């Protein structure tokens, strides 16, 4: 009895041990299922993280592209102007004015500091200031032998009046070539139509009006100069309209194979055309380049037209050719235009290259050179000192894509390595338990 009672519990333990033995082998399976669910959750989290990061990259890239058209150019000689000489003369107004230069044929913005629509009355307003506000009145009693010459004023008074004229005419621009202020024209192109339109002549016109002829009292010199500039501006607009007509004709005809971004072509052509009519330096820009650089931009961006060959699609000669491209000498008096970065419309998400010629909202700016409209001028020496203004290649876009792809691959590799470590840890964890059970059985 005692022996039987002693042996039966041991037999029960053996039976229970045999019954529960398979359950020890089920634990690794449960751990592997939990590890699998963990891997799936981690993979889903990684996937959504990649999508979110890609979305943030796209949003930041779009914001950067929109912010690249915000200009902060200031006049080079800003010390000539008092802070609040005229309404709207502050930095914000100039930023608005310069941002308008990115449009190939748009109207200038409403800005009280920069006016092109009231250019006809600019001389009358200046004459009004001379008569009623005493802007040009001498600060000391006039001598009896005072003549109409402005040289009778002391140097300090002469300098202040000259600065006032600069400040005044800096706030007026042309109608079509609206990237030019009247001050730029007076300083760089003082002889339109054989007229004397220098600042000294205008000072003699207004300062010496009291002792001069009645014609000078009415500001005839100022009005004549403004009208001469307006005639050149109108002539440039007529030439631009002729070019626009030809370009539209080629685009609307199905027998011509034009492949180009028309907004680019029209913007750079207007910039080059105005620079040919007005041989002046753009002074409100900090960084300037030779205006002849614009010629190559037109040749590069305007479409290649093949009206007599239906077989070729992307070949042929450009519709605009720059001559005298071997000219390599540099003149000290050469006009300089703003160093503009031309952003192709391809970078704006436009898939259709045959854009209508009426689309004039391309992101560009344009500035000045040369009075006569000749298809020439390019200085190769410029490329040694400034970045090229050639069309933006796909290198920058591909660089961003490659960067995102590399980051994605690295994240996937890291995830796979983490999964391998977790999987190895799960498979190795039940091994000590199996060794213990075998030792107990022994």
Curated annotation (Swiss-Prot):
Keywords from UniProt, A to Z, are:
Glycoprotein, Membrane, Transmembrane, Transmembrane helix
Lineage top rank: taxon: Eukaryota
Membrane-topology annotation of the record:
Multi-pass membrane protein
User: Which Gene Ontology terms of cellular component type are present?
Assistant: membrane
Question: Where in the cell?
Answer: Membrane
Q: Where are the transmembrane segments?
A: 42-62, 406-426
Glycosylated sites: 77, 100, 171, 279, 354
Say what the protein does. Probable component of the NALCN channel complex, a channel that regulates the resting membrane potential and controls neuronal excitability.
What family name appears in the similarity comment? Belongs to the NALF family.
Put simply, this protein is called NALCN channel auxiliary factor 2
Where does this protein come from, organism-wise?
Xenopus tropicalis
The record's gene field reads nalf2
């Amino acid at each position: 009895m005692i022996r039987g009672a002693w042996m039966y519990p041991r037999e029960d333990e053996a039976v229970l041990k045999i019954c529960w033995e398979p359950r020890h082998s089920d634990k690794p399976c449960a751990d592997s299922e939990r590890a699998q669910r963990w891997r799936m959750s981690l993979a889903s989290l990684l996937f959504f993280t990649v999508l979110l990061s890609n979305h943030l990259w796209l949003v930041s890239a779009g914001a950067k592209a929109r912010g690249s058209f915000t200009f902060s150019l200031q006049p080079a000689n800003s010390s000539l102007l008092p802070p609040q000489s005229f309404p709207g003369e502050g930095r914000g107004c100039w930023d608005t004015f310069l941002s308008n230069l990115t449009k190939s044929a748009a109207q200038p913005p409403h800005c009280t500091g920069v006016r092109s629509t009231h250019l006809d009355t600019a001389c009358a307003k200046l004459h009004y200031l001379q008569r009623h506000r005493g802007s040009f009145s001498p600060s000391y009693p006039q001598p009896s032998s005072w003549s109409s010459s402005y040289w009778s004023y002391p140097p300090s008074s002469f300098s202040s009046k000259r600065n006032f004229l600069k400040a005044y005419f800096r706030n007026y621009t042309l109608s079509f070539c609206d990237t030019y202020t009247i001050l730029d024209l007076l300083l760089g192109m003082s002889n339109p139509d054989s007229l004397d339109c220098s600042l000294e002549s205008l000072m003699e016109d207004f300062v010496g009006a009291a002792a001069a002829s009645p014609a000078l009292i009415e500001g005839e010199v100022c009005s004549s100069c403004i009208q001469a500039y307006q005639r050149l501006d109108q002539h440039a607009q007529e030439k631009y309209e002729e070019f626009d007509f030809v370009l539209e004709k080629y685009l609307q005809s199905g027998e011509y194979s034009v492949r180009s971004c028309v907004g680019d072509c029209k913007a750079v052509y207007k910039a080059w055309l105005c620079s040919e009519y007005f041989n002046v330096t753009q002074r409100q820009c900090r960084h300037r380049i030779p205006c002849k650089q614009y010629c190559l931009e037109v040749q590069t961006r305007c479409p290649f037209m093949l009206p007599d060959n239906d077989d070729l699609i992307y070949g042929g000669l450009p519709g605009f050719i720059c001559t005298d491209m071997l000219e390599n000498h540099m003149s000290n008096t050469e006009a300089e235009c703003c160093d503009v970065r031309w952003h192709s419309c391809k970078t704006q998400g436009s898939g259709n290259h045959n854009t209508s010629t009426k689309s004039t909202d391309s992101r560009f700016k344009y500035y000045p050179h040369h009075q006569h409209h000749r298809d020439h001028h390019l200085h190769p020496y410029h490329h040694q000192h400034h970045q090229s203004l050639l069309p933006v290649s796909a290198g920058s876009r591909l660089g961003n894509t490659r960067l995102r792809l590399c980051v994605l691959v690295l994240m996937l590799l890291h995830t796979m390595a983490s999964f391998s470590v977790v999987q190895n840890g799960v498979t190795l964890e039940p091994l000590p338990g199996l060794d213990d059970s075998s030792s107990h059985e022994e």
